[in-house]
Amino acid sequence: PNHPQHLERGSRKLSFGKELWIERSDFAEEPPKGYRRLTLATADKPAMPVRLRHAYVVQATSVEKDSDGKITAVHAEYFAETKSGTDGANSIKTKAAIHWLSVKDALPATIRLYDRLFTVPKPDAGEVDFRELINKNSKTVMQSYVEPSLKDAKPEDRFQFERNGYYVA
């Protein structure tokens, strides 16, 4: 569904495949205390599985890294009996559900994130020229991927990206 509490808002199909995109923050090779998303097993802790929202439970099995040690891929197994909406959906307990995209269907997108324009709450309150108080990092542009249903988005269409906030096309 487009919104689980408002079924009248319709639904869309997402394809599931062997290669998926997840957010980098949804996996930790060395998780901090209290981390509740996808992890590998360690000598003293089992792997932490997660539910892929509206899909299956997955568990990380290994990672690939580039020459700088940055993780470039997470390998995982999925448990076919845990598909959302089936009798076995809750057969493996998880502490989190994460969103994902099929690599095959994901569309590249430019995302613009905006922060405060000024570095102080009241730029006109002092004797400093307001132009000196402009936040040089008030706009961040990054490349990302979005689900295929956004390909027909029109200017000013609004979307909520789960756990991230609201965005305007």
Model-based region annotation:
Residues 1-168:
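Polyanion-binding catalytic cores of nucleic-acid enzymes and NTP/SAM-utilizing transferases
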